[in-house]
């Protein structure tokens, strides 16, 4: 296991630096620029050249990085690995100022399908992006991560709920998931730190627009923490997208250092494997490549993907269109260019990379007897006859063949007939674009908990699989065959 530890430590460093999708995208943006990738803007014309590498972001929470093969021609395919940057959490509400029996609380909204009971009695904080007014009157989006524990959702003592261990822990997501941030003892601090009000009630003002100010909608103590972290005044804070997150760092654990205990394994785990896999592709390989190698990390998978930065948006088609237009518009007629875009879609292949369920030692009956992935035994191909996953015989064979040729362990998974099945961006993309797709992911335990578990060795296995996919897919014999 020791040989896998360096890569696992890099991964947990990434996790700790990525408390929100915005931070994850910023992390990858900095790495890509340091590795020679050119930062594109979707608001400007692109100048795409063969054997060059590029990336762009959308909404600060979605990123697409691609390397153009040195032998790329009109109609050639995109070899894509797609994952997502978001995880279930609590979002701070637009009006978050809540008070109850002497406590100041922060109103939050559930995002995705989390195991919300795991958020009780944790040391919590906030992270995300804040719209800040600059001295020249312009506005800027700044990332923020308050690293100390400022929030807590306390559980109810067993003395006040004697049946909790027999009847189960029951909670209401509206009433019982409201983090406390301070007590009313902080009221003198509020009146001192803001000029808008001297009480916790809404300020009296003759300006009707003041009811929409940040100091009216959020507790002053929260705004003060944000302003201190951002280096601005409270009045400069215009709006924000903040998520609640755990302050406990990710860690390598187990007696033999086999496990990673971490938040957001789903799906920063496969986001990391996909992007590092692309970065590890050799320059000599890219020079001889006939396709475009592309990693896309979408946002909003946990809530259906229906956003400009989600997998339902036409980002893949937009990218293919702009790359082909930039490279070949001067030498092709318009109708030929449209045909080449269609050909590119038909010649493309996509790995939908999302974490998978490992066999649980305490709940073995919940798993299909012949499909029980284990931690540290390699990535998992995910199947579902009802198309909750996009894998089929030919597309899964691509992965099996790559793994066999490169000594990468691989596993297979499907749910029991009497069990519901989750889904991924795989069926969305394959159904929208007709791109051949396979669903894979590293195995993990406690999916959608605030604290999840995955395998140390699987980080390396996942990276190796994505790298070899990018380096070898175009030349696989099956792609030249008539399996359509």
Curated annotation (Swiss-Prot):
Keyword Acetylation: yes
Catalytic reactions of this protein: Release of an N-terminal aspartate or glutamate from a peptide, with a preference for aspartate
Region (Disordered): 188-213
Sequence positions that bind substrate: 159, 301, 354, 357, 382, 389
GO molecular function: aminopeptidase activity; metallopeptidase activity; zinc ion binding
Note accompanying the cofactor annotation: Binds 2 Zn(2+) ions per subunit.
Keywords of this entry: Acetylation, Aminopeptidase, Cytoplasm, Hydrolase, Metal-binding, Metalloprotease, Protease, Zinc
Single GO cellular component term: cytoplasm
Skewed-composition ranges (Low complexity): 188-206
Residues reported to bind Zn(2+) 2: 266, 302, 448
Enzyme Commission number, as recorded: 3.4.11.21
Principal subcellular localization: cytoplasm
Role noted for this protein: Likely to play an important role in intracellular protein and peptide metabolism.
Assembly and binders: Tetrahedron-shaped homododecamer built from six homodimers.
Family: Belongs to the peptidase M18 family.
Annotated protein name in UniProt: Aspartyl aminopeptidase
Species for this entry: Dictyostelium discoideum
Gene: dnpep
